[in-house]
UniProtKB/Swiss-Prot annotation:
Consequence of gene loss (knockout): Severe defect in olfactory plasticity in response to the odorants benzaldehyde, isoamylalcohol, diacetyl and pyrazine.
Upper classification of the organism: Eukaryota, Metazoa, Ecdysozoa, Nematoda, Chromadorea
Cofactor needs: Zn(2+)
Protein name per the record: Neprilysin-2
Residue spans, topological domain Extracellular: 41-736
Disulfide bonds: C53-C58, C76-C721, C84-C681, C142-C399, C608-C733
Family membership noted in the UniProt record: Belongs to the peptidase M13 family.
Entry's localization field: Membrane
Cellular component annotations (GO), alphabetically ordered: cell surface; plasma membrane
A Pfam family per the record: Peptidase_M13
Transmembrane stretches, start-end: 20-40
Source organism (scientific name): Caenorhabditis elegans
Amino acid sequence: MRPDEEDGTTKSPGSRWTRIWAIIALILLILFLLVLGAAIYFYINYKDSSDVCLSPGCIKTASVILSSMNSSVDPCDDFYEFACGQWIKGHPIPDDAPSVSNFENLGQDLEFALKELLDENDEPYDYETSAVGKAKYFYNLCLNESEILDNWRTTFDEVVKSFGGWPSLGHQMKPDASIEMLYADMVAKFKADSLFKATVQPDDKNSQRHVLLIDQPQLNLFARDFYVAAENEERMAYLQLIRDVLILLDADRTRATLDAKEIIDFETALANITMADEHRHDIAELYTKITLGEMRRSLPHFNWPLFFNRMFKDLHEKNGKRITFDDNTEVVVYGYEFLRRLDVLIPQYDNRLIVNYLEWCWFFKTMLRDLPDPFALTIFKFYKTLNIMNVQKVRWHGCVTRINSLMPMATSAIYVKNHFDHEAKQQVEEMISLIMESFVDLLLSEDWLTKETKQTAKQKVNEMKRKIGYPDYLNDPAAVNNEYKTFKVYPGHYYQTKFSFYEQYQRDVLERITEAVDRERWVAGAALVNAFYSPNTNEIIFPAGILQPVFYSKDFPSSMNFGGIGVVIGHEITHGFDDRGRLYDNLGNIRQWWDNATISKFEHKAQCIEKQYSSYVLDQINMQINGKSTKGENIADNGGLKQAYRAYKKYEKRHSRPPRLPGVNLTHDQLFFLNYAQIWCGTMNDKEAIRKLRTSEHSPGPIRVKGPLSNSYDFAKAYNCEPGSQMNPREKCRVW
């Protein structure tokens, strides 16, 4: 017997094949595990490479985001610094401005685009019939300093003569000089608003018709505070400016010094009888409708019938009948107490002083700011003292601003033709629908609103008219030409042309007194970086100029567009339900459509916002925010952010998820809030910061980020902020 037979382990041919198959199976298993490991490694490291957008637009967007952020900062500690830290370091304040911001940069980009369009002169200007031709000709007249220096005094002397002379310049006043007639002429021809504002606008209690309106004056310094506070640098610089300008106009030096002091004393007295803006939020309380007859009897020291009839003396109804007013004519007054105090103030000053004040204001607002040297140097010294600028702005900036203000639809026509992304209109339409839908959902879920109030509020949202980009007629040159057919150009004469434009612009406004309100009319041009809610027409307006980065871009993922223009849309919708907008119904009429219990609950919620913002300090100047004067805008910021985010989540469910941005390690929820914050990246010098806190109804940029985000549970969740952290306080405020 063989040894292998003796131990009982003899092997057959089948067992050998079993071993071979086992080896093969082991090899296959090893190969499978290697492939699986490689697949897992690839999945972990490269799974999203197809989900990254590498288009030039996405790369640029990612670059802008990353270059603005300070990622070393904890977003739950200081989100403004996290979002804007590097932007601020990379954007020093320019010498010709007191501040710089993303928002201001957009405005400058738009200005430059208009400049290039107005500079184009491929063919001779048709300033007889073409609106664009008139705008271009006006712009070039404005740039021609030598021609202005040759002609300005002639126009100045003619206007002053029509006023009856300027006493500060040694002109003899007529014994029967009438303040009412002088100021009426200034309002009718130059849009004057220095004694009080007088205009025509829709009646807030009957929004289908126009009405005569009186309101407080627009003072020449930045705010009422600069007059009523103790002696300050702003007022001293303003006094010096008045004196220096009077001397440049050939006034006697001694007389100029005395008159400058009297002018500023009168303006200060005028400021003291006005109401601070923070107390003017309740439009219903301010609104007083009174007849001219009642004004004549109760305010005897100003002849109101004479004033209004003089103001409209050259205006006619469509049937050719002259527009006149009698004792039965109704006037809406915003702040009747101001008029009562004005009636007491006027007799305390002689006519000579009041005429000097009115003519100074006329010159300051209509001529001084676009006269070349030596006047330009004088007003520059004033601005430099106030730290508004350290070098003079290049002249074209002011020229673009003036023509865009006087002929907004002409400049808008060329702007949208060359710079508007027409796809944006359709996309923004969808965003508005979603945001309105989200706001209605929010309204219906609020337990502090009664059922009746919810239904009326829902109706107001659903009937809110939307205007996006520009009015369609801007595509029709003939229609634009027709709008400005009465605007007359005087070749070679800048101020004569400017004043004729002023008068025609104002004529168009005043003639509406006999017409029904046209709800299709745009209240602003399209070449504008801004957005609006109009309460007496219940409409939201988004001009073409704001539909650009950082607010909107077709290269942005949807998260960023909702965090940008989406929040702006939500902000404007919320204005219809803030402390002012809530007073108007769906038709744009002031009436009480909330019951008293609901009003009380609203005011309690709004008070929380006011108290919260009043506790904030702008660290740069260690000065508290005025939570009362900024309350309406703060309510809109908070509500707009919440609505836009909810709308974005709706959008996300209905559309495919956008690809990621290259190199940006943030979720789309995080990008939503980041883009909102980066809109407000900016910096300003200390004096500008003080002016903004005293004059603006908006909180400064850092607070517009901190306030709404610290009230947002959605933000805290997106950035995993612990309760009690700086950006996720346990106590939060919200109205909507």
